[in-house]
């Protein structure tokens, strides 16, 4: 037995070790690097426009409340107001309204909403076509085709109103989280 283990040990000692050689990579001639393309178009357009995302919270409001959220120079959103003061023309191209319910499980009713591009309607005139249940969350997204048909709006004129009317009780129903995208053109100097 000892001879067998000794012979294996001798074989291991006699085995030549492998040598690994790593060849260096061939160097490529350096070419002059070009400036990277700007892929994100937001922030500065070809026609001198500028794009800004905005967000705000509206509420809380009761289940029987009616209200108007204005989008333009008379908006409650400071981001919109500040940017409109710096530019001559604007257009809101995208809007998302998320209704966050704070109502109890026993509350009844719904919240009706409407986008008014004429900026003349009252919240009490909202028809119960588009609604959210007062007890559950909901969201609605509006594109350029719904938000207005003019290419650009003067910065002293509202583009549209978001009207809502509740059919619930006097308890707190919830609030809105509103986000959107506004394009601005012709900076005021």
From Swiss-Prot:
Cystine pairings recorded for this chain: none
GO molecular function: structural molecule activity
Region (Disordered): 1-50
Domain of life: Viruses
Gene Ontology cellular-component terms listed: T=3 icosahedral viral capsid
UniProt keyword ATP-binding, yes or no: no
UniProt keyword terms in alphabetical order: Capsid protein, T=3 icosahedral capsid protein, Virion
Entries under Pfam families matching the protein: Luteo_coat
Coiled coil region boundaries: none
Subcellular locations according to the entry: Virion
Family affiliation: Belongs to the luteoviruses capsid protein family.
Remarks, miscellaneous: The N-terminal region like those of many plant virus capsid proteins is highly basic. It has been suggested that these regions may be involved in protein-RNA interaction.
Described function: Major capsid protein.
Name listed for the protein in its UniProt record: Major capsid protein
